[in-house]
Amino acid sequence: MSKQHTAQAPVDPIVLGKMGSSYGIRGWLRVFSSTEDAESIFDYQPWLIQKAGQWQVVELESWRHHNQDIIIKLKGVDDRDAANLLTNCEIIVDSSQLPELEEGDYYWKDLMGCQVVTTEGYSLGKVIDMMETGSNDVLVIKANLKDAFGIKERLVPFLDGQVIKKVDLTTRTIEVDWDPGF
C-alpha cells in the first residue's frame, strides 16, 4: 500500500461510510456509503482511515456499480490481500468539507447531544441517535434518569414547524411540541 501516507487527525471527523469486503483479486473493495445519495461519498476527498491508531490518507483511483453494490479501487491497493486489510475501515473526512446548509437544515452530527425540551419547559433528555424512516427523520432521545414518566428512550419525529419548534445549536437545545408521556 505504497500510495497511502500518514496524515494528521481531522479536527472534526465525520464518518461518510465504511469499506466492505474485497471484490475480486485486483484490490477492489465494496463500499457502504452513509451519505444521503450513496454516490455523494465520492464528492468528498481526501478520505481518511484509521489503522492501528494512525490516520492515513487513501486515494480513490476508480469506482463503479456492481449489481447492488458500489465497488472502489484505491491507489496502491493492488491485490486481494491488501484490500482485505481495509475491510471494515470507516471512511472519514473533516466536517469542514461538508457544504453549508440552508436555514432550517441540519446535519445529524450537529443534533447529537442536544438537550430536547418541550414548549412547556419539560426536559425530555438528550439526542443520542437519529433514524431515517423514509417519510421523515426521527430523533432518538435518551431520557433523564429521573424521568417523571419512567421512560428511558423517546422517538420524536423531526417535523420542522409541526413538532420541532426551535433548534438552537449555540445553546445545544431543541424545543419540541411533544407530550412527555409518549
UniProtKB/Swiss-Prot annotation:
It comes from the Bacteria. Its main location: cytoplasm. Keywords: Chaperone, Cytoplasm, Ribosome biogenesis, rRNA processing. It is found in: Cytoplasm. Residues 103-182 form the PRC barrel domain. GO terms for biological process: ribosomal small subunit biogenesis; rRNA processing. InterPro entries: PRC_barrel-like_sf, PRC_RimM, RimM, RimM_N, RimM_N_sf, Transl_B-barrel_sf. GO terms for cellular component: cytoplasm; ribosome. Coiled coil: none annotated. PANTHER family: RIBOSOME MATURATION FACTOR RIMM. Belongs to the RimM family. Binds ribosomal protein uS19. An accessory protein needed during the final step in the assembly of 30S ribosomal subunit, possibly for assembly of the head region. Essential for efficient processing of 16S rRNA. May be needed both before and after RbfA during the maturation of 16S rRNA. It has affinity for free ribosomal 30S subunits but not for 70S ribosomes. This is Ribosome maturation factor RimM.
